[in-house]
Amino acid sequence: MSEIKVGENESLESALRRFKRKCARAGVLSEVRKREHYEKPSVKRKKKSEAARKRKFK
């Protein structure tokens, strides 16, 4: 869980901006999108191999 400490004279907007940046760096949103729907293990393997193939031929 990402958390920040808001400074004494810090505005709410800047604290929110820091929190969003920290969440993005931690990969929270990408993890949520990845886990939004269940994916069968066979589908995961297929996607992984297709991604590897794309990287190889790029």
UniProtKB/Swiss-Prot annotation:
Query: Sorted alphabetically, which Pfam families does this protein's record hold?
Result: Ribosomal_S21 (PF01165)
Q: InterPro entries recorded for this chain?
A: Ribosomal_bS21 (IPR001911), Ribosomal_bS21_CS (IPR018278), Ribosomal_bS21_sf (IPR038380)
Per the UniProt entry, the disulfide pairs are: none
Q: Which GO cellular component terms are attached?
A: ribonucleoprotein complex; ribosome
GO MF entry, a single one: structural constituent of ribosome
The annotated regions of Basic residues compositional bias extend over: 43-58
**Which BP terms from GO are recorded?**
translation
Source taxon at top rank: Bacteria
Name the UniProt key words of this record, in alphabetical order.
Ribonucleoprotein, Ribosomal protein
Q: Where is this region: Disordered?
A: 34-58
Instruction: Give the family per the record.
Output: Belongs to the bacterial ribosomal protein bS21 family.
This protein is called Small ribosomal subunit protein bS21
What does UniProt list as this organism's lineage?
A: Bacteria, Bacillati, Bacillota, Clostridia, Eubacteriales
